[in-house]
Amino acid sequence: MNYLVMISFALLLMTGVESVRDAYIAKPHNCVYECARNEYCNDLCTKNGAKSGYCQWVGKYGNGCWCKELPDNVPIRVPGKCHR
């Protein structure tokens, strides 16, 4: 029984687990992508692997693109300054 658990755990680690999150997609230097239209953000987000995206009006970082189910390998806006 222990061997079965260990083999299952090893297979899980070998295949990897990719998680997703909802967040503002970030440009280099921790800046959001400014927006005016939902279509722009949806295109940007889906091209980067997200399920969808929209323009978050007057949000925490102004008018920025918010992505739903964005992969972990894509940078997101984190607390702190945008260094343009």
UniProtKB/Swiss-Prot annotation:
<feature type="disulfide bond">
    <location>
        <begin position="41"/>
        <end position="65"/>
    </location>
</feature>
<dbReference type="InterPro" id="IPR003614">
    <property type="entry name" value="Scorpion_toxin-like"/>
</dbReference>
<dbReference type="InterPro" id="IPR036574">
    <property type="entry name" value="Scorpion_toxin-like_sf"/>
</dbReference>
<keyword id="KW-0872">Ion channel impairing toxin</keyword>
<dbReference type="Pfam" id="PF00537">
    <property type="entry name" value="Toxin_3"/>
</dbReference>
<keyword id="KW-0738">Voltage-gated sodium channel impairing toxin</keyword>
<feature type="disulfide bond">
    <location>
        <begin position="35"/>
        <end position="55"/>
    </location>
</feature>
<dbReference type="GO" id="GO:0005576">
    <property type="term" value="C:extracellular region"/>
</dbReference>
<keyword id="KW-0732">Signal</keyword>
<feature type="disulfide bond">
    <location>
        <begin position="45"/>
        <end position="67"/>
    </location>
</feature>
<dbReference type="GO" id="GO:0006952">
    <property type="term" value="P:defense response"/>
</dbReference>
<dbReference type="GO" id="GO:0019871">
    <property type="term" value="F:sodium channel inhibitor activity"/>
</dbReference>
<dbReference type="InterPro" id="IPR044062">
    <property type="entry name" value="LCN-type_CS_alpha_beta_dom"/>
</dbReference>
<comment type="function">
    <text>Alpha toxins bind voltage-independently at site-3 of sodium channels (Nav) and inhibit the inactivation of the activated channels, thereby blocking neuronal transmission.</text>
</comment>
<feature type="propeptide" description="Removed by a carboxypeptidase">
    <location>
        <position position="84"/>
    </location>
</feature>
<keyword id="KW-0800">Toxin</keyword>
<dbReference type="InterPro" id="IPR018218">
    <property type="entry name" value="Scorpion_toxinL"/>
</dbReference>
<feature type="domain" description="LCN-type CS-alpha/beta">
    <location>
        <begin position="21"/>
        <end position="83"/>
    </location>
</feature>
<dbReference type="GO" id="GO:0090729">
    <property type="term" value="F:toxin activity"/>
</dbReference>
<comment type="similarity">
    <text>Belongs to the long (4 C-C) scorpion toxin superfamily. Sodium channel inhibitor family. Alpha subfamily.</text>
</comment>
<feature type="signal peptide">
    <location>
        <begin position="1"/>
        <end position="19"/>
    </location>
</feature>
<protein>
    <recommendedName>
        <fullName>Toxin BmKaTx16</fullName>
    </recommendedName>
</protein>
<dbReference type="InterPro" id="IPR002061">
    <property type="entry name" value="Scorpion_toxinL/defensin"/>
</dbReference>
<keyword id="KW-0964">Secreted</keyword>
<feature type="disulfide bond">
    <location>
        <begin position="31"/>
        <end position="82"/>
    </location>
</feature>
<keyword id="KW-1015">Disulfide bond</keyword>
<keyword id="KW-0528">Neurotoxin</keyword>
